[in-house]
């Protein structure tokens, strides 16, 4: 991902589950190591697309995990989207869920918008959503998405297991995603 980003002068997008060390799907230490790696390699544009847990962790624990993540963001990395794993980690071929996640990350079109990940979580809780079901939320600055995943950008999926990564990954790598859900 780094070689590609540097060669083509493109941003790096990290996407995966925001959870604690008890999860079978992701480990925050892996994400923190990636942030450290890209910082040491002087990669200037690093954007995060976070999937909140609430299934393998308590249903309102994303705020704590986000606080821990923020303490490891030291080089201008920005959170671009945040959403529940219900959308981004579906494996039941319920493509409308995947499409919602994809549209938030690629087109900056989320069901919800917020000016920070903290605001997104707070608003989700106010709507009665738990971490697993936080609607795909685009984080904006000056009424524009912080970042979207564009053509030729480098994308790194940091989940440890592949079973819940396949469907969203397919949306990124197979041409004509809109026809996949038919």
Language-model-derived ranges and their functions:
Residues 1-182:
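…; additionally, a secondary subgroup of soluble metalloenzymes is captured
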């Amino acid at each position: 991902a780094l070689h590609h980003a540097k060669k083509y002068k493109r941003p790096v997008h990290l996407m995966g589950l925001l959870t604690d060390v008890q999860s079978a799907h992701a480990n925050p230490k892996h994400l923190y190591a990636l942030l450290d790696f890209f910082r040491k390699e002087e990669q200037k544009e690093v954007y995060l697309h976070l999937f909140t847990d609430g299934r393998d962790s308590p249903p309102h624990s994303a705020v704590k995990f986000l606080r821990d993540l923020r303490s490891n963001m030291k080089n201008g990395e920005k959170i671009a989207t945040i959403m529940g794993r219900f959308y981004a980690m579906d494996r039941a071929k319920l493509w409308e869920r995947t499409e919602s996640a994809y549209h938030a990350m690629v087109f900056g079109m989320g069901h919800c918008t917020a000016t920070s990940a903290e605001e997104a979580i707070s608003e989700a809780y106010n709507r009665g959503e738990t971490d697993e079901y936080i609607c795909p939320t685009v984080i904006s600055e000056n009424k524009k998405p912080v970042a979207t995943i564009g053509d030729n950008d480098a994308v790194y999926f940091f989940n440890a297991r592949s079973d819940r990564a396949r469907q969203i990954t397919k949306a990124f790598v197979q041409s004509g995603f809109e026809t996949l859900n038919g």
